[in-house]
Amino acid sequence: MSGTNNVAQARKLVEQLRIEAGIERIKVSKASSDLMGYCEQHARNDPLLVGVPASENPFKDKKPCIIL
């Protein structure tokens, strides 16, 4: 039982390694510079960086709490 189980696991591992070997790779320095460029180009549209105008914020309370 364990022999056939080990063979099946080894086949799955080999298949996964073949898939990963076929993936195109780029250097980290290239990927990081591309990512930084993308972030800089899209920063003005990012609501986490520039904020959401109060008039467009659906989560802002429309009225203050009456209890307080």
Curated annotation (Swiss-Prot):
SMART domains: G_gamma, GGL. The keyword Acetylation applies. Guanine nucleotide-binding proteins (G proteins) are involved as a modulator or transducer in various transmembrane signaling systems. The beta and gamma chains are required for the GTPase activity, for replacement of GDP by GTP, and for G protein-effector interaction. Plays a role in the regulation of adenylyl cyclase signaling in certain regions of the brain. Plays a role in the formation or stabilization of a G protein heterotrimer (G(olf) subunit alpha-beta-gamma-7) that is required for adenylyl cyclase activity in the striatum. One of its GO terms (biological process) is behavioral fear response. It is found in: Cell membrane. It is a lipid-anchor. This is Guanine nucleotide-binding protein G(I)/G(S)/G(O) subunit gamma-7. Pfam families: G-gamma. Keywords: Acetylation, Cell membrane, Lipoprotein, Membrane, Methylation, Prenylation, Transducer. Brain. Found in the hippocampus, striatum, midbrain and cortex. InterPro entries: G-protein_gamma-like_dom (IPR015898), GGL_sf (IPR036284), Gprotein-gamma (IPR001770). A lipid is attached at C65 (S-geranylgeranyl cysteine).
